[in-house]
């Protein structure tokens, strides 16, 4: 099954999907910067492990799961197909979430600030940029176990929202919200550098937030 990964990470997995016999494999995306570009916030070592090992593992597992589902469907093995689909969902989430995460980061010197339209929306919906950051930090730090904190756009309510998703659940399919920026709080995202100090990592990540990308996502989501 070939996935079309957009800024919202749209994905339909379940009853209604098809598998091509000439399926293209998913590949680990190149980072838009070097492993050391996010220092001192994220070390080159943690970036190499996180991207080159953990994200790569999700990509490989997704390819394997898709192949297993294809084989199970060909054999008429419903039980194996269902089990394989669960693995596809999990690893698709890991692949898309990480892709959005990497794209939303940049070197400290390039972080910038929200464009005027996004800043206006932030002030309207949260009062100030600092208040929004504090609220998302608190929600993200409080995640039990592993998961993701999100700044998102609610197209129905026409406003910004904050959300958290456990494990590798995808934001838009589970909440209807369109992702703008995400914070990974799986331990592999920070433990090598920040040890058990998740709050320090979450607060520091904003120093490398790519506000140009986040602003562009907002404009696109708003339509």
From Swiss-Prot:
Show the Pfam families listed in the entry: Sod_Fe_C (PF02777), Sod_Fe_N (PF00081)
Q: Which UniProt keywords apply?
A: Manganese, Metal-binding, Mitochondrion, Oxidoreductase, Transit peptide
Q: Which Gene3D superfamilies match?
A: Fe,Mn superoxide dismutase (SOD) domain, Iron/manganese superoxide dismutase, C-terminal domain
User: Where can this protein be found?
Assistant: Mitochondrion matrix
Q: Cofactor(s) for this protein?
A: Mn(2+)
Q: Which residues bind Mn(2+)?
A: 50, 98, 184, 188
Q: Which reaction does it catalyse?
A: 2 superoxide + 2 H(+) = H2O2 + O2
Return the EC number. Answer: 1.15.1.1
Q: Does the keyword Transit peptide apply?
A: yes
- What are the boundaries of the transit peptide? 1-24
What does the cofactor field's note say? Binds 1 Mn(2+) ion per subunit.
The chain's disulfide connectivity reads none
- Describe the subunit structure: Homotetramer.
Protein name from the UniProt record: Superoxide dismutase [Mn], mitochondrial
Organism for this UniProt entry: Onchocerca volvulus
């Amino acid at each position: 099954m070939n996935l079309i990964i957009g800024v919202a990470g749209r994905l339909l997995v379940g009853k209604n999907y098809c598998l091509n016999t000439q399926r293209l494999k998913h590949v680990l995306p190149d980072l838009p910067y070097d492993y050391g570009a996010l220092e001192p916030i994220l070390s080159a070592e943690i970036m190499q492990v996180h991207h080159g090992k953990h994200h790569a593992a999700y990509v490989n597992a997704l390819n394997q799961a898709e192949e297993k589902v294809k084989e199970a469907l060909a054999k008429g093995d419903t039980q194996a197909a269902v089990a394989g689909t669960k693995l596809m969902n999990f690893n698709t989430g890991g692949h898309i979430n990480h892709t959005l995460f990497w794209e939303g980061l940049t070197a400290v010197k390039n972080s910038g600030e929200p464009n005027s339209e996004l800043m206006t929306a932030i002030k309207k919906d949260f009062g100030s940029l600092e208040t929004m950051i504090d609220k998302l930090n608190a929600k993200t730090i409080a995640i039990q176990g592993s998961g993701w904190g999100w700044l998102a756009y609610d197209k129905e309510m026409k406003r910004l929202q904050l959300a958290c998703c456990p494990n590798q659940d995808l934001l838009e399919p589970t909440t209807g919200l369109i992702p703008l920026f995400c914070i990974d709080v799986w331990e592999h995202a920070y433990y090598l550098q920040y040890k058990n100090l998740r709050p320090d990592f979450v607060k520091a990540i904003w120093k490398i937030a790519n506000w140009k990308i986040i602003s562009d996502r907002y404009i696109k989501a708003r339509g």
